[in-house]
Regions:
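Short-chain dehydrogenase/reductase
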Residues: 2-86, 99-100, 110-111, 201
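Short, small/polar-rich loop/turn modules that mediate ligand/substrate recognition or access, typified
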Residues: 87, 180, 185, 244-246
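Active-site helix of classical SDR
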Residues: 127, 164, 172
C-alpha cells in the first residue's frame, strides 16, 4: 500500500520547531516532499534543523526557506520552492506567536498588531497565495490553518491572541466556501496545551502547577505532544479526508468541550 502522501509536496510554516516540526516530519514519513518555511532553521528545543532530520530519516526531499509569514513575498517564495518539487498539494499555515499575557486595558497597539499580523494575516495571505498556486495547477489541494482552543473560547490575559485565533476559525470557513469549487479543502485545527517552546518558555504551562491542574480535568488525563497535532494534520492533508472541508478540530484531549 502506498504511503498516504506519496508523490505530494507540502509547505509547513513555522516548521523549525514545535508542532510545525512534528507535522513536517510526519508528512515526510508519509511520503511527501516538504518545504520548511520559518524565520530560522534552528530548532528552539535544540534539535538538528528539520530539513536535515527529514533527509536523514526518510527518502523525502526537504528544503528550508527563510520565511516571515507577515511578508507576502516570503510566503510566495516558500510556495515557489514547493512548485520546484513538482507542485503544491498541501499548505499548513502553522506559524504563530502567543505574546505576553496582559489584561485587555494594558495591550498596546504595537503588541496587538504584531499578534494579528503573525497569527491572522499570515494565515490569510498564506492561504491566498497557496490557493492561487493550486488553482493554477488545477489539481486541487488541502490547506490546514492553525488556530487554538483560544479561538474557540474566551481566554483572559491573551485577548489579541484569542481574537486572531478566532478570526482564523471563521476565515477558514469562508475560504472553504470560496475554494471548494476548485477542489481545495480548507480546515482549521485547535490545539490545546501541547508541549512546545511556546508552552514551556513563552507562556509556560509544562513544568508548572498548571500542568497538573489541567491534566487532572482533561478527560484523557494528559496534555498534548506535537505528534498528536501532526497525526490530525496528516489526516487532513491526505485523501482520507477527501470529503472534509470547513471543519474545526480541537486537539486537546477533550478539555474544551467538557470543562
Amino acid at each position: 500500500m502506498a504511503a498516504l502522501l506519496d508523490g505530494k509536496t507540502a509547505v509547513v510554516t513555522g516548521a523549525a520547531s514545535g508542532n510545525g516540526r512534528a507535522i513536517a516530519r510526519r508528512f515526510a514519513t508519509a511520503g511527501a516532499d516538504v518545504v520548511i518555511a520559518d524565520l530560522q532553521a534552528e530548532d528552539r528545543m535544540g534539535g538538528d534543523p528539520t530539513h536535515e532530520v527529514i533527509e536523514g530519516e526518510t527518502d523525502a526531499r526537504a528544503a528550508f526557506v527563510e520565511c516571515d509569514v507577515t511578508d507576502r513575498d516570503d510566503l510566495g517564495a516558500a510556495v515557489s520552492r514547493a512548485e520546484e518539487f513538482g507542485g503544491l498539494d498541501a499548505m499548513v499555515n502553522n506559524a504563530g506567536i502567543v505574546g505576553p499575557q496582559k489584561p485587555l486595558t494594558e495591550v498596546g497597539y504595537e503588541g496587538y498588531r504584531q499578534l494579528m499580523d503573525a497569527n491572522l494575516d499570515g494565515v490569510y495571505f498564506g492561504t491566498q497565495i497557496a490557493a492561487a498556486a493550486m488553482i493554477d495547477r488545477g489539481e486541487g489541494g488541502s490547506i490546514i490553518n492553525m488556530s487554538s482552543v483560544a479561538g474557540l473560547e474566551g481566554t483572559a490575559g491573551i485577548t489579541p491572541y484569542s481574537a486572531a485565533k478566532g478570526g482564523v476559525r471563521l476565515f477558514t470557513y469562508a475560504a472553504a466556501a470560496d475554494l471548494g469549487p476548485e477542489g481545495i479543502r480548507v480546515n482549521a485545527i485547535h490545539p490545546g496545551a501541547i508541549e512546545t517552546a511556546m508552552t514551556t518558555e513563552d507562556s509556560p504551562v509544562f513544568g508548572t502547577e498548571q500542568e497538573e491542574q489541567m491534566s487532572a480535568v482533561t478527560p484523557l488525563r494528559r496534555l498534548g505532544q506535537p505528534e498528536d497535532v501532526a497525526n490530525v494534520v496528516l489526516f487532513l492533508a491526505s485523501e482520507l479526508s477527501d470529503f472534509v472541508t470547513a471543519e474545526s478540530i480541537a486537539i486537546d484531549g477533550g478539555l474544551v468541550n467538557t470543562a
